[in-house]
Amino acid sequence: MQTVQLSKEINPHFYDMWTTDKPYIVCKGGRGSFKSSVISLKLVTMMMKYIQQGKTVNVICIRENQQYLRDSVYNQILWAMNILHVSNEFQTRVSPMTIRHTLTGSTFYFYGANDPQKLKSNIVGNIIAVWFEEFANLKNVDVFDLSLIHI
């Protein structure tokens, strides 16, 4: 197994995010601050810790506009998996958009926030994290409220 020095991949501005015990984290930074890169590394790292314990867990990734999911958060998670050398442990799908660990079934689910009611119909258990990409751009606070109800 290849060792990865995460401190070289993370903007020092976001170091505190890695050790916080707070349930909600807001990462602020301008374009090019590597917010999404740091978040994706954190989420993949979190999932892999559970997988190593033999547990099945899930992560929900939400972005305002569904049509940009693949070019943003989906590819960002794939990038993080590549950096962490775990890509070969996962199976990718674009319809429905998921990235699934082949042995445990742990899955990254990707949803557009265009229609908050669609989030209500998705039944996903064992959720360890929800990523709201570009949270400030969400047009409707219902997306946040509805997703928390279903966690």
Predicted regions and their residues:
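Phosphate/NTP-binding elements of NTP-utilizing enzymes
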Residues: 1-149
